[in-house]
Amino acid sequence: MNLKPLADRVIVKPAPAEEKTKGGLYIPDTGKEKPQYGEVVAVGEGKVADNGQLVQMQVKVGDKVLYGKYSGTEVQVEAEDYLIMRESDIFAILG
């Protein structure tokens, strides 16, 4: 992937949607929930604060993160789906 986010933006590869329920029933494509977690694949340089200093990003490439259901903008690069979002749209880093 040749995509570099700017400023405080992050590119996340969403986790695949669940194919079947815990009970073993297969979920049709129309019934699948969007995953709300994924892996960070690229990060920007950071945000410039009001005082002119660069605020470093807290997330890094490889982090597993939780984000809001409607966070980010969906993009497709080389037949892969990604989300571009601001770091502030990320709720938590999974340990």
Curated annotation (Swiss-Prot):
SUPFAM superfamilies, A to Z: GroES-like
InterPro entries, A to Z: Chaperonin_GroES, Chaperonin_GroES_sf, Chaprnonin_Cpn10_CS, GroES-like_sf
Entry GO terms, CC: cytoplasm
SMART domains reported in the protein's UniProt record: Cpn10
Keyword Cytoplasm: yes
Gene Ontology MF terms in the entry: ATP binding; metal ion binding; protein folding chaperone; protein-folding chaperone binding; unfolded protein binding
Annotated compartments: Cytoplasm
Domain of life: Bacteria
Keywords from the UniProt entry: Chaperone, Cytoplasm
GO biological process per UniProt: chaperone cofactor-dependent protein refolding
Function statement: Together with the chaperonin GroEL, plays an essential role in assisting protein folding. The GroEL-GroES system forms a nano-cage that allows encapsulation of the non-native substrate proteins and provides a physical environment optimized to promote and accelerate protein folding. GroES binds to the apical surface of the GroEL ring, thereby capping the opening of the GroEL channel.
Subunit description: Heptamer of 7 subunits arranged in a ring. Interacts with the chaperonin GroEL.
Alphabetized PANTHER family for the sequence: 10 KDA HEAT SHOCK PROTEIN, CO-CHAPERONIN GROES
Family the UniProt entry places it in: Belongs to the GroES chaperonin family.
NCBIfam families, per the entry: PRK00364.1-2, PRK00364.1-5, PRK00364.2-2, PRK00364.2-4, PRK00364.2-5
Protein name: Co-chaperonin GroES
Species assigned in the record: Chlorobaculum parvum (strain DSM 263 / NCIMB 8327) (Chlorobium vibrioforme subsp. thiosulfatophilum)
Taxonomy of the source species: Bacteria, Pseudomonadati, Chlorobiota, Chlorobiia, Chlorobiales
